[in-house]
Swiss-Prot record:
Family, per entry: Belongs to the IspH family.
Protein name: 4-hydroxy-3-methylbut-2-enyl diphosphate reductase
UniProt KW keywords: 4Fe-4S, Iron, Iron-sulfur, Isoprene biosynthesis, Metal-binding, Oxidoreductase
Biological process terms in GO annotation: dimethylallyl diphosphate biosynthetic process; isopentenyl diphosphate biosynthetic process, methylerythritol 4-phosphate pathway; terpenoid biosynthetic process
Cofactor: how and how many bound: Binds 1 [4Fe-4S] cluster per subunit.
Residue sites binding (2E)-4-hydroxy-3-methylbut-2-enyl diphosphate per the record: H41, H74, H124, T167, S225, S226, N227, S269
E.C. numbers: 1.17.7.4
UniProt function note: Catalyzes the conversion of 1-hydroxy-2-methyl-2-(E)-butenyl 4-diphosphate (HMBPP) into a mixture of isopentenyl diphosphate (IPP) and dimethylallyl diphosphate (DMAPP). Acts in the terminal step of the DOXP/MEP pathway for isoprenoid precursor biosynthesis.
Active-site residues (renumbered): E126
InterPro entries: LytB/IspH (IPR003451)
Enzymatic class: oxidoreductase
Binding site for isopentenyl diphosphate: H41, H74, H124, S225, S226, N227, S269
Pathway: Isoprenoid biosynthesis; dimethylallyl diphosphate biosynthesis; dimethylallyl diphosphate from (2E)-4-hydroxy-3-methylbutenyl diphosphate: step 1/1; Isoprenoid biosynthesis; isopentenyl diphosphate biosynthesis via DXP pathway; isopentenyl diphosphate from 1-deoxy-D-xylulose 5-phosphate: step 6/6
Length: 314
């Protein structure tokens, strides 16, 4: 048996930045540091930060007045920002800049009173935060997950309408939804460039190539990670057995029956250390060769807030 590694895989720039913000806040200010929602959707990462003194909460009422709080990479609503301000919380914002870009699109629509349609998964924290950028009773924001939801929309064609998307969606599914949306509302406006982020796009393309070569695709990522789920779904749609695992302990020996080539990748919030532990476990189970696809190079870097940049000693 051999493993073929997808490339790129694992951490994206937004996740790197979010984790660095928590680590630097702990280093500079000391524990406890409060984090609203899991900073990224990965159990290993969250547990590691918790051990270092990060306290993860779902709502700000769990944070003492005046404390330091970090907003997760998924972003928050304007109401959450206002609550933090009113309670004098010291905020470090780990919202991915590419999510912030979508927030700005929604805020612009809100200011103009333009009706906004967000394509995304109901209940996902990124979607909740993005919907929460709209604050204009003269307009409105509407969530659609699939083409069936579009049929339920009752907006008129003579209204100003714009759309935007969650950043971690399936490229193929979203393209289909946008096509139907444009058929129903021919004058609808949208972003010049797709809101699905570069990392989601690159990792899905890498899995597309990986699935062509594999008998089994293993995706390292947590069950609540949107982009990790999309990778497993994509491989499965291409006719390959796909498994989403948190770590090497989730691997079942029976998966390897009649398998010659294992494709291995990781979601954007899964660290490389987990990939390496999976490789080690698979070697114990008979893998004797590891290859890596060439893939595309990623060089995107997002800076942490200036208050957290540690100056080098001269």
């Amino acid at each position: 048996m051999k493993i073929i590694l997808a490339n790129p895989r694992g951490f994206c720039a937004g996740v790197d930045r979010a984790i660095s913000i928590v680590e630097l806040a702990l280093e500079i200010h000391g524990a406890p540091i409060y984090v609203r929602h899991e900073v990224v959707h990965n159990r290993f990462v969250v547990n590691g930060l918790r051990e270092r003194g990060a306290i993860f909460v779902e709502e700000l009422d769990e944070v003492p007045n005046g404390a330091i709080v970090i907003f997760s990479a998924h972003g928050v609503s304007q109401a959450v920002r206002q609550e933090a301000k009113e309670r004098n919380l010291k905020v470090f914002d780990a919202t991915c800049p590419l999510v912030t870009k979508v927030h700005m699109q929604v805020a612009r629509a809100s200011r103009k009173g333009t009706k906004a349609i967000l394509i995304g998964h109901e209940g996902h924290p990124e979607v909740i935060g993005t919907m929460g950028q709209y604050d204009n009773d003269k307009g409105g924001i509407y969530l659609v997950e699939d083409v069936e939801d579009i049929a339920k929309l009752t907006l008129r064609n003579d209204e100003d309408i714009t759309f935007m998307t969650q950043t971690t969606l399936s490229i193929d599914d979203t393209a289909g939804v946008i096509e139907v949306l444009k058929q129903k509302y021919p004058a609808i406006q949208g972003p010049r460039k797709n809101d699905i982020c570069y990392a989601t796009t690159n990792r899905q393309q890498a899995v597309r190539e990986l699935a062509k070569l594999s008998d089994l695709v293993i995706v390292v990522g947590s069950k609540n990670s949107s982009n990790s789920n999309r990778l497993a779904e994509l491989a499965s749609r291409m006719g390959v057995t796909a498994k989403l695992i948190d770590d090497a302990n989730d691997i079942e020996v029976s998966w390897l029956d009649n398998v010659t080539v294992i494709g291995l990748t990781a979601g954007a919030s899964a660290p490389e250390i987990l990939v390496q532990s999976v490789i080690s476990r698979l070697k114990e189970l008979g893998v004797d060769k590891v290859e890596e696809l060439e893939g595309c190079e990623e060089n995107t870097v997002f800076e942490v807030p200036k208050e957290l940049r540690i100056k080098e000693v001269e």
